[in-house]
Amino acid sequence: MTEPAKLPWSDWLPQQRWYAGRNRRLTGAEPSVIVGLRDDLDLVLVDADYADGSRDRYQVLVRWDAAPVSEYSTVATIGAADDRTGFDALYDDEAPQFLLSLIDSSAVRSASGAEVRFAKEPDAQLPLEAMAHVSDAEQSNTSVIFDRDAIFKVFRRVSSGINPDIELNRVLGRAGNPHVARLLGTYEMAGADGTPETAWPLGMVTEFAANAAEGWAMATASVRDLFAEGDLYAHEVGGDFAGESYRLGEAVASVHATLAETLGTSQAAFPVDNVLARLSSTAALVPELTEYAATIEERFAKLATETITVQRVHGDLHLGQVLRTPESWLLIDFEGEPGQPLEERRAPDSPLRDVAGVLRSFEYAAYGPLVEQGAQNTDKQLAARAREWVERNRTAFCDGYAAASGIDPRDSAPLLAAYELDKAVYEAGYEARHRPGWLPIPLRSIARLTTA
């Protein structure tokens, strides 16, 4: 059990795409929990400490000696300890199947006061013989796909508490909602008092949506088709996305209705303090926000005395979080806004938070190609066509949502606009840090929303 402590964690962690400390200086990283799953496989929780006093805890499954799949050898190799080499086990040929078998048998593994519990959902069938490969998708966790049957999401940055991705998938699946992939199993480290509130969720397995297309890919393909047909309106182009936007609106409304029925609703004040705090911190980073700040503050302040209906929602919904299967739309990744504490990600919010997320995603799908081409400020015709595409799909989505729920988001225009503004402010901060070339997209939207 001493070998994991000898691995070069401070060198390896910052190289991983799921590492969350890129804007902080790492001062040290060492294992805090080591649980042996078998002789050549350890579950390790690594505490990463930063110069600002903060700490993250990461989960790494370490396979000893066995060579990983060759194409991943560099990213998977952690380093040497004594006479053995440690690898990220998720890239191994066989270790993921073993982890799946632990879930299938509802196994328990213990060491040094830590207990890891694997659990299969009732009546779940796990593909124990399926071939496994790591998904190439950029994300904050690591997903392993088992043929066309299941996807195993291993949480990387972990914390104690009820994980909303597991919680909401379970609730929606057991309620029979058709717009989520069925939860098959989970695993967690037990907390000090044995309750879900103190447990450390570590991963989950759901059905894999074979033959599914990502909403983002479908939407951007539609935009490219529109741009290629300079003499046609959006509804005349073969790749028109409005029908899918309508059906997506129906799916989101269905999920919201199930969550409201099963977990309830309540009344709460509009979170004016939270949105103003985000605006203040982002404006300090993005000087371009200064000219809009007073108007945004005024819009938010008008809602300060409003009482709104809140419930559990997705929390970070956009076109990259939805999949189109041959039968319907599926919503995935119910983790909420990345980087926020679990308690905040589980907090009830207005369903308009999710609606605004999709509407903002339409803006990105339409204007992203212009940014990539460097044409966002020069090609007036393409910009006009992008706006046409956005408005057509906004309308279709809201129409579908209203048809399925009986509640039209546009009837709460000031509140919906406030959630859109809050999301655009968040996007401005993200783009300023990571993709400055994309900053005009949220800034353009903020200008439009503050003059509407």
UniProtKB/Swiss-Prot annotation:
SUPFAM superfamilies: Protein kinase-like (PK-like). InterPro entries: Kinase-like_dom_sf (IPR011009), Mak_N_cap (IPR040999). Keywords: ATP-binding, Carbohydrate metabolism, Glycogen biosynthesis, Glycogen metabolism, Kinase, Nucleotide-binding, Transferase. Pathway: Glycan biosynthesis; glycogen biosynthesis. It holds the Pfam family Mak_N_cap. GO terms for molecular function: ATP binding; kinase activity. Its EC number is 2.7.1.175. The keyword Protease does not apply. It is an enzyme of class 2 (transferase). It comes from the Bacteria. GO terms for biological process: carbohydrate phosphorylation; glycogen biosynthetic process; trehalose biosynthetic process. The keyword Transferase applies. It catalyses: D-maltose + ATP = alpha-maltose 1-phosphate + ADP + H(+). Monomer. Catalyzes the ATP-dependent phosphorylation of maltose to maltose 1-phosphate. Is involved in a branched alpha-glucan biosynthetic pathway from trehalose, together with TreS, GlgE and GlgB. Belongs to the aminoglycoside phosphotransferase family. This is Maltokinase. It comes from Mycolicibacterium paratuberculosis (strain ATCC BAA-968 / K-10). The lineage of its organism: Bacteria, Bacillati, Actinomycetota, Actinomycetes, Mycobacteriales. The gene is mak.
